[in-house]
Amino acid sequence: MSPQTETKASVGFKAGVKDYRLTYYTPEYETQDTDILAAFRVSPQPGVPPEEAGAAVAAESSTGTWTSVWTDGLTNLDRYKGRCYNIEPVAGEENQYICYVAYPLDLFEEGSVTNMFTSIVGNVFGFKALRALRLEDLRIPVAYVKTFQGPPHGIQVERDKLNKYGRPLLGCTIKPKLGLSAKNYGRACYECLRGGLDFTKDDENVNSQPFMRWRDRFLFCAEAIYKSQAETGEIKGHYLNATAGTCEEMIKRAVFARELGVPIVMHDYLTGGFTANTSLSQYCRDNGLLLHIHVAMHAVIDRQKNHGMHFRVLAKALRLSGGDHIHSGTVVGKLEGERDITLGFVDLLRDDYTEKDRCRGIFFTQSWVSTPGVLPVASGGIHVWHMPALTEIFGDDSVLQFGGGTLGHPWGNAPGAVANRVALEACVQARNEGRDLAREGNTIIREAAKWSPELAAACEVWKEIKFEFPAMDTI
């Protein structure tokens, strides 16, 4: 063997495959304030020890690969590697473990949710040694939080822009979601807004289809906003969906919305992508637009209990990427959402600081420092009988969005909006008077219906409508 090709053990590199746990399982590690911490629910393949599975997650989502490579000697792996520092079995589940992994901050580009997720929830989710893998929670260190702009404006600035305080905001998604012409769509918006709603909304499917091009929709909705504002004396808005096939087209639509003088635009942030969302959020901050975020596609990622990513992680990512509203489930409506878990990530959206609380699924204490809060949006299968529960569960800093619960009113859109506004005002007044909304909710609605024929009609239509299915995702 020639000197040029000879290898020596003393060089420090030995080819071959070694157990991940020898390098990446470090139970003695003390986490740093600057580490990104992740809690993974790991289901190893039969015969794979949990320590090896947890170490494999840490390795494959940071510096590791399947074999030893000589270029490991050209860097400081102890500085850059992820570390599985704790493993605990999941109570009541066989062969499932919560594996805690710490990532040094230098692994991630500043201000990039895209880069963070590419590492933490990248190829490792297809790793054969694991039957399933789910990211349950992240702790984003303050040092990394400060590299993001966050929401364009936040809760307090939005209230100041709208001049609306002391109650949840009311919205409505226009139905049918597809097929209306732009003029009829604008008419539906106008009827809802003049009836007492604060917002109407494009459905997530509405972009720029042959039956209704985006520019026509924007124009007719702007007309509805200004006409209803003139009649009611209240500031109104419509979530104009700027989501498009390219970032350039998305920004063009947002620019047109700004030129029309409307207060808010909308983005489907998962189908549109985090890079596009962050760009739109920064444009909205610079140009005074509020940004409503829809979560279409989230259930593909978060619905399964043992694989994917929990919605609380998506919510944290959105607060970093930027959005003033985000759909968060209803607890009482037609969409998935267990109460304690939902309130856990609602607090993560709104509060500056959230303590670790495993009873609500919060694995880490999280500080958002000066990052503005995000309004949770309760939407999906809700109607006037749900109003007391929604007011009690979500409080004032929320948006309650009734699509079918407005447009399905037997007398039309405007009476449907009146019914929802009367029900909301009655619940807020009762709460402020010290009444128990959880116990007296139905009585409060019936009392208000005596003075509002619109509410009485709504109560009759939806008196037996319930969505009582168990949540799939529980603690």
From Swiss-Prot:
- Swiss-Prot/TrEMBL cofactor(s): Mg(2+)
Cellular component terms (Gene Ontology): chloroplast
Q: Where is this site: Transition state stabilizer?
A: 334
Please tell me where substrate binds in this chain: 123, 173, 177, 327, 379
Q: Which residues bind Mg(2+)?
A: 201, 203-204
**N6-carboxylysine (modified residue): where?**
201
Q: What is its main location?
A: plastid
Q: Which reaction does it catalyse?
A: 2 (2R)-3-phosphoglycerate + 2 H(+) = D-ribulose 1,5-bisphosphate + CO2 + H2O; D-ribulose 1,5-bisphosphate + O2 = 2-phosphoglycolate + (2R)-3-phosphoglycerate + 2 H(+)
Residue positions, PTM N6,N6,N6-trimethyllysine: 14
Q: What's its EC? A: 4.1.1.39
- PTM field: The disulfide bond which can form in the large chain dimeric partners within the hexadecamer appears to be associated with oxidative stress and protein turnover.
Q: Name one GO biological process term.
A: photorespiration
What is the scientific name of the source organism? Amaranthus hypochondriacus
Organism lineage string: Eukaryota, Viridiplantae, Streptophyta, Embryophyta, Tracheophyta
Gene name in the database record: rbcL
Tell me the InterPro entries matching this sequence. Answer: RuBisCO (IPR033966), RuBisCo_large_chain_AS (IPR020878), RuBisCO_lsu_C (IPR000685), RuBisCO_lsu_C_sf (IPR036376), RuBisCO_lsu_fd_N (IPR017443), RuBisCO_lsu_N_sf (IPR036422), RuBisCO_lsuI (IPR020888)
N-acetylproline modification, residue list: 3
- Its domain of life reads Eukaryota
Annotated active site residues, numbered on this chain, are: 175, 294
Q: How is the subunit organization of this protein annotated in UniProt?
A: Heterohexadecamer of 8 large chains and 8 small chains; disulfide-linked. The disulfide link is formed within the large subunit homodimers.
Q: Which PROSITE patterns match?
A: RUBISCO_LARGE
Record's family? Belongs to the RuBisCO large chain family. Type I subfamily.
What the record notes about the co-factor is: Binds 1 Mg(2+) ion per subunit.
Q: What is this protein called?
A: Ribulose bisphosphate carboxylase large chain
MF-aspect GO terms: magnesium ion binding; monooxygenase activity; ribulose-bisphosphate carboxylase activity
